[in-house]
UniProtKB/Swiss-Prot annotation:
GO biological process: L-histidine biosynthetic process; methionine biosynthetic process; purine nucleotide biosynthetic process; tetrahydrofolate interconversion
Keyword presence, Metal-binding: no
InterPro entries (alphabetical): Aminoacid_DH-like_N_sf, NAD(P)-bd_dom_sf, THF_DH/CycHdrlase, THF_DH/CycHdrlase_cat_dom, THF_DH/CycHdrlase_CS, THF_DH/CycHdrlase_NAD-bd_dom
Keywords per UniProt: Amino-acid biosynthesis, Histidine biosynthesis, Hydrolase, Methionine biosynthesis, Multifunctional enzyme, NADP, One-carbon metabolism, Oxidoreductase, Purine biosynthesis
Subunit note: Homodimer.
Function noted in UniProt: Catalyzes the oxidation of 5,10-methylenetetrahydrofolate to 5,10-methenyltetrahydrofolate and then the hydrolysis of 5,10-methenyltetrahydrofolate to 10-formyltetrahydrofolate.
Protein name stated in the entry: Bifunctional protein FolD
Reactions catalysed according to its record: (6R)-5,10-methylene-5,6,7,8-tetrahydrofolate + NADP(+) = (6R)-5,10-methenyltetrahydrofolate + NADPH; (6R)-5,10-methenyltetrahydrofolate + H2O = (6R)-10-formyltetrahydrofolate + H(+)
GO terms of molecular function: methenyltetrahydrofolate cyclohydrolase activity; methylenetetrahydrofolate dehydrogenase (NADP+) activity
Biological or metabolic pathway of the protein: One-carbon metabolism; tetrahydrofolate interconversion
Organism: Bartonella tribocorum (strain CIP 105476 / IBS 506)
HAMAP family: THF_DHG_CYH (MF_01576)
Pfam families reported in the protein's UniProt record: THF_DHG_CYH, THF_DHG_CYH_C
Length: 299
C-alpha cells in the first residue's frame, strides 16, 4: 500500500510556489528576498546543511549570503555581525547554524537576531505569538511548520475530534508542534522519554509526532491502527555494511514495521527533512513581505 508521505515531492510543490511569489515581489515591488546564514567553525554536518540551504535559496531567486567564521570567534564578534545583518535592508532572514561552540551562549545569540528576521522562529517574540495563536503574525519554526503541512495534506486544516500525541518537548520541535496542533483544534498530549506508560499514551493517538531523538523508539504495537505518523527524528548510526566508518540515517520510528499499521507515515530520510528547508524558504519570503508591509503569501 502506498501510505508513505513523500516529503521531497511536497517540498518541491512548495518551492514552486515560493519561486512564483519571489518573481511577483521582484517584478511588482523590486524586492528580492535575502537570507544570511552564519556558520561558526567547520563542523562537517553543519557545512552540508548550510550548503543545502544556500542552494535552495538561490534556486528560489533569493539573495543568499553565507558568513563563515572561525570556531575561535568570540561571542561579542558574533553579536556585532548579527547587529550588522539586523540593520541591512537587503537581508530579510537571518539563520545562525547550530550547534555553536561551547564558549558562546546559544540563547544570547538566537535572541540577538531581530524577531522580524528570525526565520528559525526561535526568538521569544515569535515563540510568544505562536503560543498566543497569532499564527498569521508569527514566524513558525521550520520543522514543525513542515510537519504540520504534511498532517494537513491527510487530515485537512481542522483537526477537531482527533487526538494528537507529540513525543518530545524541545523548544525547536516538540513545544511548537504541540502549539500548532492545538491551534488546529486537535486534543494534544505532550509526552517524552520519561512519560509513564509511554506506549499506552502513543496508542491513543490519531496523529503521532515522534521528535525524541531515540532511534526506532516507536514500535508497531505502540501505534493505533490507521494513525498518521510523522517521524521528526534524525539519528545517524553506524552502517558497517557500507564500509568502515560509514553511517546511515534512521528516525525515531521503527519505519518498516510501523508502516504496515499506519494510514500514513513519513520516511527518514526523505520525509520531514526536505520540508524543513522548504519552510525556511517560506519563512524568508514571508519575512520579506512583512518587512515591506506587503500582503503575506499564503501556503
Amino acid at each position: 500500500m502506498n501510505n508513505i508521505i513523500d516529503g521531497k515531492k511536497l517540498a518541491e510543490e512548495i518551492i514552486v510556489k515560493v519561486k512564483a511569489e519571489t518573481i511577483k515581489l521582484r517584478n511588482n515591488y523590486n524586492i528580492q528576498p535575502g537570507i544570511a546564514v552564519i556558520i561558526v567553525g567547520d563542523d562537517p554536518a553543519s557545512q552540508v546543511y548550510v550548503a543545502s540551504k544556500n542552494k535552495k535559496a538561490e534556486e528560489c531567486g533569493f539573495l543568499s549570503i553565507k558568513h563563515v567564521v572561525s570556531k575561535e570567534t568570540q561571542e561579542k564578534e558574533l553579536l556585532q555581525l548579527i547587529a550588522t545583518l539586523n540593520s541591512d535592508p537587503k537581508i530579510h532572514g537571518i539563520l545562525v547554524q547550530l550547534p555553536l561552540p561551547a564558549h558562546i551562549n546559544t540563547n544570547r545569540i538566537t535572541q540577538a537576531v531581530a524577531f522580524q528576521k528570525d526565520v528559525d522562529g526561535f526568538h521569544y517574540v515569535n515563540v510568544g505569538k505562536l503560543a498566543a495563536n497569532a499564527l498569521e503574525d508569527a514566524i513558525i519554526p521550520c520543522t514543525p511548520a513542515g510537519a504540520m503541512m504534511m498532517i494537513e495534506q491527510h487530515c485537512g486544516r481542522d483537526l477537531s475530534g482527533l487526538d494528537a500525541v507529540v513525543v518530545g518537548r524541545s523548544n525547536i520541535v516538540g513545544k511548537p508542534m504541540a502549539a500548532l496542533l492545538t491551534a488546529a483544534n486537535a486534543t494534544v498530549t505532550i509526552a517524552h522519554s520519561r512519560t509513564r506508560d509511554l506506549d499506552d499514551v502513543c496508542r491513543s493517538a490519531d496523529i503521532l509526532v515522534a521528535a525524541v531523538g531515540r532511534p526506532q523508539m516507536i514500535k508497531k504495537d505502540w501505534i493505533k491502527k490507521d494513525a498518521i505518523v510523522i517521524d521528526v527524528g534524525i539519528n545517524r548510526i553506524p552502517a558497517p555494511e557500507k564500509g568502515v566508518g560509514k553511517t546511515h540515517l534512521i528516525g525515531d520510528v521503527d519505519f518498516e514495521n510501523v508502516k504496515e499499521k499506519a494510514a500514513a507515515i513519513t520516511p527518514v530520510p526523505g520525509g520531514v527533512g526536505p520540508m524543513t528547508i522548504a519552510m525556511l524558504m517560506v519563512n524568508t519570503l514571508k519575512a520579506a513581505a512583512r518587512l515591506h508591509n506587503l500582503p503575506i503569501p499564503k501556503f
